[in-house]
Amino acid sequence: MLGRFFGRGAGGNWRPPAQELAFASQAGFDTVQIRSDRHALEDELGVDAAELGRLFDEHGLEPVLELLVRYDDDGGAATRALEATLPDLQTVGVLRVHVHPVGHVDPAALTADLAGAAAAAEEAGLLFGVEHNAPGHRLLTRLGEVEALLDAVPRLWLVWDVNHTPADEVGGYLALRERFSLVHASDTPLPETNWHLPLGQGTVDLAPLRGFDDVPVILEIGGLPHSGGPGLDTDEALLDSLAWLRGPS
């Protein structure tokens, strides 16, 4: 359930995978999300895929991967990102991979690209998902867009980001639960979205998150410049957010 929001060189609390996975295991997390912006895991993390897979196995943790993909009126970005990382995914032992699309592309081209990537991932035995964006971005910002995309691409999974979701759309996203491959959890002072605060520092209703026993809930609490970050993903904040997520003992 751990995902440092910012990576190496981005001003957050990044550290080498051996240290990060040891912390996650000792703290009681069961899943760790890797984020790749350049689609080369060794370049991102400083260790090769075989060593990374060994570390995940050693600590008994599930690896999941987020690929940031940038569209510039050109379809195919998600498929290219998946193809570039697929050998590493299989070596590490990743089951759940998703893209976080940014930029601009025609909706039909986006749908076609995600359909192709989802089919390729399914053939490789992977669950391939897409993360929706917060209002103010260009791609997949409203519930209706997400519903239409999932209807058009039955193989595609969804990563629900609670911190991207206006309060009046929460119920609609929960109705899509059977399509969730991951949930991203952080807090925000609604109606503002996309602050990525530690849990308990905003106004998000956390209660629905406590019922996801079959889907990993990833803490993305790094913060953004407008919300006091990056750097809010300290060990103490992650442990406190994990306690919020688990609720009263």
Residue spans of the language-model regions?
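Structural motif corresponding to the early beta-alpha repeats
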Residues: 21-25, 30-111, 164, 215-218, ...
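Hydrophobic, well-ordered secondary-structure segments
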Residues: 107, 111-118, 127, 143-146
